[in-house]
Amino acid sequence: FKENVFDDALTTASILLLAKDKNSTEINISTIESKLDLQKVVDYTNSYPKLKGEFTYKPSDLDPNIKWRKYYQVQNSDKYKNLVPFSKYAKVVRGIATGANDYFTFRPSKAKEFSIQSDNLLPCVCKAKDVKKAFFTSNDFKELEKNDELTYLFDAVKSTNSAVEKYIKKGIKEGISEKYLTKSRKIWFSLENRPPAPIWVSVFNRNGLRFIRNEAEISNLTTFHCVYLKQSDLFSSIDTNLLFAYLLTDVAKEIFSDNGREYGNGLNKFEPNDLNKAQVLNLSLLNSETVDNILKLYRKYKEEQDKVYIEQLNEIFISKYSQTESHTYLKFAQNQ
C-alpha cells in the first residue's frame, strides 16, 4: 500500500492471499496505490490462479534475510556501483535506555534541588529537539545548560554522597527500582555502558536520516542511535570526517532509505541493524585527490553552514559512483 488504508495500522500494510493447493511454483506481488485499488484483491481471488501480479517470482528467488520491498519497489541503491555494508565502516547501537527517564534525567535546577554534584551527573543529550544542527559542540551543550534543559543523567554507582543516597532511596520508594529495565540490572540505578559516540543518527524521520557530529563528546539517550567507527581492521578503518561528509549527502540518505521501516503519514524509523545492514558507497576506492576535495568542502560547510557545499559533495559522489540504470531498476520504474 502507498497510503493509509487501515486506520489502526501505523506501519506499512500488506494483504497476504494464501491458497491451500499445490500451486506453489510462483509468488505474485502487486502494489495498491489507494483504497479504490482494493478491487484488485477481489479480482486476484476470483481469477486465481490465472491472473498474474505486477511482479512474479519463484520461491527460490526470494531472500528472507532482506527487506521484501526489494521485490516490489525501486531500490535507490540500484543506481550506484561499488556498494558495501555500512557495518564495514561502523557499528550502530541504540542510545542509553534508562528505564525511567523522569527519574534519571536532570536539569541544572533539578540537580540543585536535590544537591546532586557534577561527579554524579553524566552529560547527555536527552531530546532530539535540543540538537538543531549537523554539528553539536561544547558551546551548544553549555547553551542547553544555560536554558535549564535536560542535560544530565543520574550516575550514582560507587558514590557515598549522602544526597545521592537520599535520591536512590527516593527511587526505591517511588518504585523506580522495580520497573522493567531497572529491576533486571545487578544494580538497579546503574547506567548502560555507552561511551560517547562520534556520530549520532536520528531514530525517526520524515525527510531522510539526520546524522550529527558529536563534537561535544557527550552521551545520548535513545532519541538517537550511536555510530561507532571500526578501527580494528586497518583496511576497513576510515577517517571520521570523510565518513561524516558522505553521511551528510542526499546520496547517503537515498541509499539508506532502502532499509528503513515505513510508518503512517510519511514517518520512517531505523533500528540499529537496519543501518548496520544498509548499503553505503565504498569510500576506500576514492583517490587521495578526491578525498582532499571532499574534506575541503566538508570544512567549508562546517564553517559556513551553507548547503551549497553539501550539494557539491553530493555531485562528487554521484559522479564517482553512479552507474547506468540496471535492468532491475528499469523493470520497477516501468511499473511505477
Spans of model-derived segments:
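Signature of N6-adenine DNA methyltransferases within the class I
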Residues: 1-101
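Short, surface-exposed, charge-dense and proline/glycine-enriched linear segments
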Residues: 1-4, 26-37, 60-63, 209-221, ...
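Short secondary-structure transition/capping segments
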Residues: 11-21, 44-55, 228-232, 291, ...
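Short flexible/disordered coil segments
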Residues: 26-42, 60-68, 244-252, 261-266, ...
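Polybasic, glycine- and aromatic-enriched phosphate-binding surface used to engage nucleic acids
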Residues: 74-296, 307-310
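Amphipathic alpha-helical coiled-coil/heptad-repeat segments
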Residues: 249, 285-336
